[in-house]
Amino acid sequence: MKAAYNYRATKTACSDRQVLILGTSWADPQPGTMEEIRISIVNDKATRNKRNIEEETDLSPPPKKLRSAVFLCSTPSSAPHCSQNVEVFDEFDDSLLEASSDESDSPLHMTLVQIEELLEDDCDYAAEPPRWDEESDSVGFLQELAVPNGSQSDLVELRNLNSPLAGEQSDSSQTLTEETVCSQDTSNYAAMAPSPCWSNISTAGQNEEAGGNVSTTTSPVLHKHEMDRGSRDSDICSTLSSSHLPGDLKVVDEISETSDIPFDGDIDELLTLSPGDTTSSEEDKITSESTPILSKLESVPVVHSHSEAFCKSSSSLQLPETSLASSTEPSPSLQLSASSVTAMNGQNNSNKVPPPTSDTAPGPQLGTDTNSQKSKGQKVEPKKNKPIEQIGLKQGGKSFAAPVDHPVKENLGQTSKEQVAASIGCKKKVNPSPLQEKKHGAVPTKPRAACRPQISNSELEKNRNIYRDRVMMHLEVHSISEEPNYELAYLLNETSRENPTWQHPSDYTKRNYYVRRQPAPCSLNDWVMRNGGHSIQRFHGLPCTFKRSPMPGVLPTGPT
C-alpha cells in the first residue's frame, strides 16, 4: 500500500487531503496492472461547514472540548474582534450549550439561558429612565402627611396643583414652587442629585432682581408650615439662612416634623437641618407677624466669601422705606444675618460718602443706628438673643463678612444704650506696640595684623641694665644681704665671673656627664690569664650532650 498526500494551502485553515491507494501485487510489479483508487476526505475546518447534530447523535454524548483562554460573554464586549478572529478559533464549539444530566454545574445553580436573562434584565433596569407617573401615589401620600390637620379643601388644592394641567400652567409661567419639589422622589434622598429647584425665598429674591417679570405663586398650606417653622429656625447661626439650603431639605424637614415617619438621612444632612427647639406661644405670635419682613429682607442678595454682591448697581438693592423702618426693629425671635445687615448698611449709605476702611468691627455704626431710631420716636425692644457683630476684612478689593457671636446675659431691664455699650465693650482694640528701634553702638575696629616685635640690641641692653639696678636697689633697701641664700648666690656669681670654665648651677645649657674610661683592648688569651688562667674550669659543669661548633685550628672538636 502506498499513500500519497496532497495539501493545498489556504488562508483560513488546513486544506482538503486526497489519498491515492494503488492496488498491486508482488508477483506482478508491472505498473499496467495497478488499480488506482482515489478517496477524497473533506475537512470541515477548511470549508467552515457545521455538522448536523441530528446525524451525529450517538449513544454516548460527545466529550466536551477545551475552550481557549479568551473569555467570551453574552454581554457586549469592548473588543469585538475576539469572536470574529478566525485565526484564533478554529470552530464554534456547541457542545457546552447542550443540556447535561445535571443542571447544577454552575455555582449559581442556574443555566446559561437564565443567567443571560438576568443580565438583560439588569441592563434594561439601568438604562430605563425614572418613571414619574408611577410615583404620583407616593408623592400624594407624602403631601397628605405634610398636612395632617388640614381640611379636605386643602387636599383637593394640592391634588389639583399636581395634576398635568397645573404642571403645564406652571411651565408656561416659568415659576418654581414647593409643589414641584414634592413631585420628585423623596423616598431615597441620600442618593438623589442636587435639585435645580429653589425655595420661595430665593425665587422672591430672583424676582426682585429681574424687575418683577416673574410671578411668585406659593401654596397656602406649605406657607403655613413655613410660618410655624420660622420660630424654630430663629436660634440657628445667622450665616446659614433658609435660602442657602436646597428645596429638598425643606420638604424633608417639614415631613419629619409633621409626621411620625422616621427620617433616614446622612449625618451631613442632619447637621444642616434645623434642631427644632421649642419656643413659647408669645414668640410664635411675634414670628408669624414678622414673617413677611423676613421674606423681604432675605430677598436681598447675601454676601458670601466666594461672591461679589456689592459690585451690583444700587438699583437692585432698593427697598421701600417702610420695610427698612420695620426691619430695623429687633424682635426676640427674629435674628438678621450679618450678610443682610451689611447689605442694608450699604443701601442706606449708597448716596453718602463711604466711611474710611478700618480693620476693627463696625461698632460705632450700631450706636448711630440706635440714636437715629430714638430721634424718630421709635421704641427699641431689648434683644433676647445673642447680638451679632460683623468683622469686615477687605482683601484685594473684596469684602469678606465673618459673624462673631459674643454671649450676653439676658436682662429685660437693659436699654438699647446699655446693650450697645456692652457690645462695644466686648471689642478689644488692639494697639500694635511700637517697633523697638535698634541701638546704634560703636562699630568694632578691625584687629591689626599680628607682627613679631623687633627690639634693637642697644635698647635691649639698656633695659637689662635698668632691671638689674632696680633689683639691686630692692635688695639693698630690704637689707637681705645677711640671709644665707643671698650670700650663696653672691658667691656663685663671683666664681662664675672669675672662672669662665666653671659651670654655674643655674646654667642648664651645659650638663656635667660622667665619662667611663674604656679598657685597653687585648686578646682572649690575655683576658684569660688576667682572670685566673686555665686552671679555672669555667664550663666543667656542662653536660656531655652540649657540643660547640667545630672551629678547626682554634678550638678542639670535643672534650677528651
From Swiss-Prot:
Short name of one Pfam family: S100PBPR
Organism domain of life: Eukaryota
Principal subcellular localisation of the protein: nucleus
Biased composition, class Basic and acidic residues, residue ranges: 378-387
Composition bias type Polar residues, residue spans: 313-352
Residue ranges, annotated region (Disordered): 259-292, 313-400
An MF annotation (GO) of this entry: calcium-dependent protein binding
Protein name, entry field: S100P-binding protein
